[in-house]
């Protein structure tokens, strides 16, 4: 599954599937060596992706210094950061911001658009709700008696939590952009 996504250039989804597979394997076997082997393989895959895929190299370059290319390739992340900053504590209000300034705001940069219109307090509350959902999913997984159901719950929880991390992390320039949407929001 991961290779099909890599071949189709959907590396954000491939990364999510890889992390889910890795954590489900660890949950099923409890072998830390598998976890470290997966982290090593993932690190090698990240370096290879950087050298093979030009859009990955471009996203890393933008992530490192978006301000030098603010008029071209760095425009999206710079507008995202401007929107978050302009939203301040309480935001402009519903429909009062300018999320259309951020290209594809309705998908990968929904967090920035929401922060601009509703403020940082709302965004922190949204992140706490996401964290609460993740904790609930992991709590359900820990209570499952059957391995199959535990793996399903862990898989869903990790998919949700990692997708939130990738989306918000990309919007605030903590990690390079991945093109992944914010679950249940975007």
Where are the language model's segments positioned?
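Hydrophobic alpha-helical segments of polytopic membrane proteins
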Residues: 1-51
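Transmembrane alpha-helix interface/packing and boundary motifs in multi-pass membrane proteins
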Residues: 1-9, 86-91, 166, 174-182
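Membrane-interface segments at transmembrane-helix junctions in multi-pass inner-membrane proteins
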Residues: 6-8, 12-13, 68-71, 182-186
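Hydrophobic, glycine- and aromatic-enriched re-entrant/interface helices and adjoining loop segments
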Residues: 34-126, 145-152
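Hydrophobic alpha-helical interface/terminus motif in multipass membrane transporters
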Residues: 60, 137-141
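Transmembrane alpha-helices of multi-pass, membrane-embedded glycan-processing enzymes
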Residues: 126-133
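Loop-to-helix entry and N-terminal half of a specific, functionally important transmembrane alpha helix
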Residues: 141-179, 185
């Amino acid at each position: 599954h991961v290779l099909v996504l890599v071949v189709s250039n959907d590396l954000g989804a491939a990364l999510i599937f890889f992390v889910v597979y890795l954590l489900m394997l660890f949950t099923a076997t409890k072998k830390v060596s598998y976890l470290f082997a997966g982290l090593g393989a993932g690190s090698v895959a990240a370096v290879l992706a950087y050298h093979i895929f030009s859009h990955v190299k471009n996203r890393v370059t933008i992530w490192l210094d978006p301000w030098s290319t603010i008029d071209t390739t760095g425009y999206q992340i710079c507008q995202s950061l401007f929107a978050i900053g302009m939203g301040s504590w309480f935001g402009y209000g519903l429909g009062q911001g300018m999320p259309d300034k951020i290209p594809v705001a309705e998908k990968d940069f929904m967090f920035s658009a929401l922060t601009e219109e509703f403020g940082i307090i709302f965004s922190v509350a949204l992140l706490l709700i996401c964290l609460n959902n993740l904790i609930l999913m992991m709590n359900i997984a820990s209570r499952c008696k059957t391995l199959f159901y535990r793996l399903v719950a862990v898989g869903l929880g990790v998919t949700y939590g990692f997708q939130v991390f990738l989306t918000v992390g990309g919007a605030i320039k903590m990690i390079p952009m991945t093109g992944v949407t914010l679950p249940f929001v975007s």
